[in-house]
């Protein structure tokens, strides 16, 4: 039976609404007779702003409330920043499609007094704002002379904190800045040899219920096959390492012909240990490439690093 009304669950943050409204517009364009509504809500991660994300210790900080709406029949799909979506989903839900990825890189954003500097030339003791353990660990490894300070809030709030002098610079996702119209604030795109990006960064994941083939059919117009292959490899890598959103795991994925190559990294929080390797394989089976790379890093000690972090978090 054809679906007449599609309900979308979304976070209510400004970035989330920009992303969800884009999905809504694209679906309306593809399915002119379909009525589409958005149910926006705050998630646990949106409500807890005075505690570092890593200390909250929940893999579904930005997704559980949206998933609950689908599980009780109040929404057919949910739109997520794919990097926020755990690799293991609740029973009855699935990752229906992945949109074309925007720039997945991390970006350096500075205030006016630091406009002359790049990440490499920032003076010793400069205060770098980031809420990501992945960015923190990699930057500590490469730039131990810098100071790192947690920063929470939406993108606009973070930029206000930067411009008021609380930080010398911020590290943010380039895609989020561009989607919100702040692309001109990107001072430097941080290369992958310094900071590998998060799993799924720059792409949107559309989660849906498993037993609604008519919903799956509707949203496939948004699926981008090359991005999907990249992100499936990355998510398989993360799943084997048993890492959530708040662990120092980074990736980069490239496709050449019928081959996909995944680079992956695990680092200690103090930045003193960093394990990095790569794995290539057939594009037809991207998840196998992700799993193989995860086992390769585990053989080099990545599991021990992650176990130390998990034990540290449990003790807090």
From Swiss-Prot:
UniProt GO cellular component terms: cytoplasm
Positions bearing S-(dipyrrolylmethanemethyl)cysteine: 245
One Pfam family recorded for the sequence: Porphobil_deam
Listed InterPro entries: HemC (IPR000860), Porphobilin_deaminase_cofac_BS (IPR022419), Porphobilin_deaminase_N (IPR022417), Porphobilinogen_deaminase_C (IPR022418), Porphobilinogen_deaminase_C_sf (IPR036803)
UniProt catalytic activity: 4 porphobilinogen + H2O = hydroxymethylbilane + 4 NH4(+)
Highest rank taxon of the organism: Bacteria
GO biological process, one term: chlorophyll biosynthetic process
GO molecular function, one term: hydroxymethylbilane synthase activity
This protein's UniProt keywords: Chlorophyll biosynthesis, Porphyrin biosynthesis, Transferase
Enzyme Commission numbers on file: 2.5.1.61
Pathway membership, UniProt: Porphyrin-containing compound metabolism; protoporphyrin-IX biosynthesis; coproporphyrinogen-III from 5-aminolevulinate: step 2/4; Porphyrin-containing compound metabolism; chlorophyll biosynthesis
CC cofactor note: Binds 1 dipyrromethane group covalently.
Cofactor(s), names only, from the UniProt record: dipyrromethane
Enzyme class label: transferase
SUPFAM superfamilies xref list: Periplasmic binding protein-like II, Porphobilinogen deaminase (hydroxymethylbilane synthase), C-terminal domain
Other facts: The porphobilinogen subunits are added to the dipyrromethane group.
Cross-referenced PANTHER family: PORPHOBILINOGEN DEAMINASE (PTHR11557:SF0)
NCBIfam families: hemC
Assembly behavior: Monomer.
Similarity-based family: Belongs to the HMBS family.
Function: Tetrapolymerization of the monopyrrole PBG into the hydroxymethylbilane pre-uroporphyrinogen in several discrete steps.
Protein name as catalogued: Porphobilinogen deaminase
Organism: Synechococcus sp. (strain CC9311)
Organism taxonomic ancestry: Bacteria, Bacillati, Cyanobacteriota, Cyanophyceae, Synechococcales
Gene coding for it: hemC
